[in-house]
Amino acid sequence: MLPGLALLLLAAWTARALEVPTDGNAGLLAEPQIAMFCGRLNMHMNVQNGKWDSDPSGTKTCIDTKEGILQYCQEVYPELQITNVVEANQPVTIQNWCKRDRKQCKTHPHIVIPYRCLVGEFVSDALLVPDKCKFLHQERMDVCETHLHWHTVAKETCSEKSTNLHDYGMLLPCGIDKFRGVEFVCCPLAEESDHVDSADAEEDDSDVWWGGADTDYADGSEDKVVEVAEEEEVAEVEEEEADDDEDDEDGDEVEEEAEEPYEEATERTTSIATTTTTTTESVEEVVREVCSEQAETGPCRAMISRWYFDVTEGKCAPFFYGGCGGNRNNFDTEEYCMAVCGSVIPTTAASTPDAVDKYLETPGDENEHAHFQKAKERLEAKHRERMSQVMREWEEAERQAKNLPKADKKAVIQHFQEKVESLEQEAANERQQLVETHMARVEAMLNDRRRLALENYITALQAVPPRPRHVFNMLKKYVRAEQKDRQHTLKHFEHVRMVDPKKAAQIRSQVMTHLRVIYERMNQSLSLLYNVPAVAEEIQDEVDELLQKEQNYSDDVLANMISEPRISYGNDALMPSLTETKTTVELLPVNGEFSLDDLQPWHSFGADSVPANTENEVEPVDARPAADRGLTTRPGSGLTNIKTEEISEVKMDAEFRHDSGYEVHHQKLVFFAEDVGSNKGAIIGLMVGGVVIATVIVITLVMLKKKQYTSIHHGVVEVDAAVTPEERHLSKMQQNGYENPTYKFFEQMQN
């Protein structure tokens, strides 16, 4: 009996442990729940040990539908009967959150609000009611709303009673993450002030992701998309700048670690997902609106000492409240006022008129990225503040214009629409100026690093005696500097092409020119190795591997950038295929001075490797696809033994042959199109002639047939035109020997 009772008590204690939180900092440790952060693998709570585990499949990231979240809960907890999901009330801190498609998981903590996976039949949460606090609840059977709605209802109800919302829970589920009521606990302000301060301190020390990006405005959504795309591009450039080139063997790992912090920051600012709650974001908007209102005494004449938040000063100030009416920027104490509106201070304090100008006037330095981020935040804060002010003015104007004529209302709406559009355009211009300035500074930094790397490389070559390993290390740094410039250019063009194809078409020639300069500069720098054949032969394999590794990434992007979209001329079968177009452009650059093969590794060094036909002939181009060619084996050394005149002849010959290739290619298309046009004209002429001939034949046949009918006569018979059809028919019958029996009968009687 006693062992059985012990087992029952143990089972009951285990079931209770699954419901009661054990650690407020880590969330509901033993309760089934999932957490998501876009760009990283989903996490779920291990109900056995209270720790967060990564996605079992290693592939799934943030989910944007409540149905999908419920299904995912059922997948990660197959042994539990998951019937519904609901957003948690408090955020949780998760360590070592793995990025998607990356093995390393050591990152700084992330704070997100998880989803609770509800097991079995719904049971409302048991709320603790501290001393001096009140337990309240609201139910509406005609309403089925989300967790966010009922949280707002509970908070406003507590605010009306001059109390703070301490805790709350959902009641009466009516759908996935939808309910018909809420239970909550309201506590006096003094009881909650410590909780508010500690929560603010925790948020200030952590990177909290609330599941949304910066506030969008309807008229500027497109500019926002462009800005986000450009910021992502700048992020990629800054990641490259953070690379540590000193470690030659483990450079890739160092670069990956350097990219980690900014990639996470980009994800937090640009990821838009519905996997975490928007409760706090909505509350922040309400707080910002409340704290931006002017203090109102109200219609009553009492003299009650209260506090309000002064936006211009960034602090709370006293005023006298009349006792009724007014607005919500009305607090009993200064501490409570600052606890509520303190979060508004950074936004308003940063929005100085010259916030962006300071960045533009300050020269770039090693902390360029940090300065750019601060300038961007100040710009967005200023824009949000100005838009909020316009929206408040618009709302007030609409209230005052309710009784005005329809034409006046329309004029008011048009005025504020134009004002909003003007602000959006101004903000877009400032963003563009900010990004362009940052891009220019990044390019300048890349140029400086490349110049320094080239100087070190040349110095290593000129050393007596030259050290092959040192030369290779300097060459490796120089090649990486060039490749960073190349990748930066390609990524910039890719982003521009995605957000503004017209602008991409305009800058395409500039991008191609810049890439040609990079290719030529690299070829000239690599040819310096030929001056020292011993060093070149010793590091040949390493250089081959270096160039192949550095070029693999950029070739695909370059091929996509160079390829033009096909244009239909009414007969696509006559146009060259996309593969042919890509191959032609890759093999025949714009000015014929280089090709992608010029950057491939070489396999021969020294003066003996110069081709015998250098003066009169250019090596034929391999027309196979790049994937089939592999590493080129054409010699690239011996340039030091070729005279300047010979180099000029080779370059001119190459230009002539490449240019000729372009001419022939286009002439074939033109002549082919002309042949097709002439064939179409001949076909049309033949068709018209055929129609005319057919018409003549038909008319001739009709006339012949008519003539045949009219020419059949057995004698001359005069027919009165006035006779009836019956008489005419009888006459024809008589012509053919027909005799009317009636007439014959009467003739016989007469005879």
Swiss-Prot record:
One of its GO terms (biological process) is collateral sprouting in absence of injury. Residues 737-751 are annotated as: Required for the interaction with KIF5B and for anterograde transport in axons. Residues 713-732 are annotated as: Interaction with G(o)-alpha. A motif (Basolateral sorting signal) lies at residues 705-715. Residues 18-682 are extracellular. Disulfide bonds join 38-62, 73-117, 98-105, 133-187, 144-174, 158-186, 291-341, 300-324, 316-337. Glycans are attached at residues 523, 552. Cu(2+) 1 binds at residues 147, 151, 168. Residues 316-344, 363-428 are annotated as: Heparin-binding. Cu(2+) 2 binds at residues 658, 662, 665-666. There is a cross-link at residue 744 (Glycyl lysine isopeptide (Lys-Gly) (interchain with G-Cter in ubiquitin)). The transmembrane helix undergoes a conformation change and unravels partially when bound to PSEN1, facilitating cleavage by PSEN1. Binds, via its C-terminus, to the PID domain of several cytoplasmic proteins, including APBB family members, the APBA family, MAPK8IP1, SHC1 and NUMB and DAB1. Binding to DAB1 inhibits its serine phosphorylation. Interacts (via NPXY motif) with DAB2 (via PID domain); the interaction is impaired by tyrosine phosphorylation of the NPXY motif. Also interacts with GPCR-like protein BPP, APPBP1, IB1, KNS2 (via its TPR domains), APPBP2 (via BaSS) and DDB1. In vitro, it binds MAPT via the MT-binding domains. Associates with microtubules in the presence of ATP and in a kinesin-dependent manner. This is Amyloid-beta precursor protein.
